[in-house]
Amino acid sequence: MGYSLGYIGEHWEEYRAVLYIVLLLPVLIHFLIRRKTQLSNSDKSSEKKDEVKKQREVKRFKRVGKRGKIGSPSSSIRKQNDTIDWKNSPLCVFYSTLGGTAERYAKQVHEELSSLLQRDDIQLLNLDYVDLSEYFVSCPENAIYLVVLPSYEIESSIDYYLSSLQESFSDFRVPKDPLHGLSGYAVFGLGDMENYPGDKFCYQAIQADKWIKKLGARRLAPLGVVNTQLAPTAQIDALLQWTRSVAECLKNGTLLKIGNTDSLSSDVMDVEDMGSMMAKAKAEAALPVGTKEMVSTESPTYKALTKQGYSVVGSHSGVKICRWTKSAMRGRGFCYKYSFYGIRSHLCMEATPSLACANKCTFCWRHGTNPVGTSWRWKVDPPEMILQGILKAHYAKLKLMKGVPGVLPDRYEEASRVRHCALSLVGEPIFYPYINEFVSMLHEREISSFLVTNAQHPEALRNMGMVTQLYVSVDASTKQSLKSVDRPLFKDFWERMLTCLEILREKRQRTVYRMTLVKGFNMEQIKEYTELIRLGVPCFIEVKGVTYSGNSDQSPLTMKNVPYYEEVIDFVKKLIEYIDIHLQDLGVRYEIAAEHAHSCSILVAQTAFKKDGHWHTHIDYPKFFELIRTKKDFGPFDYMASTPDFAMFGNGGFSPEDTRFHRKKKTQTSKPISATISETATISEAAA
């Protein structure tokens, strides 16, 4: 239907309102729809923000590893309540000591807490002899740690403990906050404020407190420190007051708030009150790397080693006269090295250019008095100084035997010229940065070198030059048993040992596996030893029963762990049987070549050292030095010598030119040698 303009004009006023409504209606509808959409999007955005916020709250409580792994949040959420189940939480008192003071303090803390908390299950643990990874990388859930630490300006095992904490914090393989599962911790430090003031006072206890907290643990009580120059009674009173404050905190079931230290004696300072002292405390050590002495003359380590008969040379070397040297000078017999290799004991010097070691072996006869470490961080003495020092100290010790009843004049005269050097005294000789230069100086003086390594430094072994005889200690055949026997410091100790054995196979020189048998620890898995022999294919295998070196709080060994000689023989025979069965593809055969019954020692050798049906395990020393001077390549068969009949298996291994000495006992007469082997073993035999 059409409308004219005239008609629209006549009726415009009548229909104008309706027309406006029709035209504006789509706009209104569009506006309403858009408004509704905006409100809907706003609600969704708000919900999304709430969800993100919730996720962030959850993540805040989760352990996130440095590789991005997320752990359980339960422990951290629980920790928000600051509650402690002190009746059921494992409680450990740790300590480290050189002179014994910190040990006495730790025992005092242990006894006081046991009494106050009415608990008989509190553990007292020496940091030097526990697996640090079991306590400070993975820890017992809800455990409570108390740490009693002295501080030394000299090198000590505390340096290794602190470096382990720092490495755990920096190691991407270690989950973040590994100690978050602890209910709490507290540290007590001992320091000499008069002699070591300022930033040296209790600096290692301060570092321990700092690193344990960085690893996720929550401080149970402020760090306590005491001045050891106070009167003994004042020191003990201060220690007990700190211990009681910890016990009170545990009984209250809550973490002690910072600043709540009114109960502490004025003789005990907490970390918050130390102010600038805490700020000054060095992050690593009191002295830069390379300036600390491994064994200072003022250190408890020095005093302990000298008390045991060692002469400490320079800052990290040592020498000692072994019992077999004294025995040989009296004509009472030589050690097993004479039976096996032709070394006359009075011509041999036992020494080491490194008193530090990377293991804390259960059968070590130093009872923890030598330093430990995984990397060289000390002052380095030059090899010339070390060689001159150990020779001087060795000869000085020998002079003390002049005129001693029973000493043979000809043996005493011969002993004034060292012919052999056994680098097996203590520690890890190959650890010394200039070991090759040191050995070369020995050879220049025509002193043979017998170097023993614990198979924990593969790079040093790979770079090791020619020695007269190169040993690797193989103290166990499985990873777990090696960990139990050697208590190594390296986390990858097993891989390091396997690598060292492979490197040994590449060496074109006389190589030896030294196996120390510890009953109840490493005598069961005989078959597994054959696989280790496959890796290194040594020229010789020395098998020796462990020497009992006396009781020690740090060693679990007793006389029950010392095998009888018959048991050592049985082990060797079974080992050879397994080698014949499982290593036929190598084309190498092993047999028993020699023995030294008095030392519970047997030598197994490759049959290649049997010439015309007779063993040649001894060494032609003049020939060896002649070959060294040519500077040409040579091998182990180029300087071998005939083994004497007395050393053959079945003949005992005692030199016929000497007289066997039997120590008389008040309660019994001498027994046959086969029955008394384990009982006559001495510290020096283990060192020989």
Curated annotation (Swiss-Prot):
FMN binds at residues 97-101, 187-221. [4Fe-4S] cluster binds at C357, C361, C364. Residues 341-580 form the Radical SAM core domain. SUPFAM superfamilies: Flavoproteins (SSF52218), Radical SAM enzymes (SSF102114). One of its GO terms (biological process) is wybutosine biosynthetic process. InterPro entries: Aldolase_TIM, Flavdoxin-like, Flavodoxin/NO_synth, Flavoprotein-like_sf, rSAM, tRNA_wybutosine-synth, tRNA_wybutosine-synthase. Keywords: 4Fe-4S, Iron, Iron-sulfur, Lyase, Metal-binding, Nucleotide-binding, S-adenosyl-L-methionine, tRNA processing. One of its GO terms (molecular function) is metal ion binding. Its EC number is 4.1.3.44. This is S-adenosyl-L-methionine-dependent tRNA 4-demethylwyosine synthase. It comes from Schizosaccharomyces pombe (strain 972 / ATCC 24843).
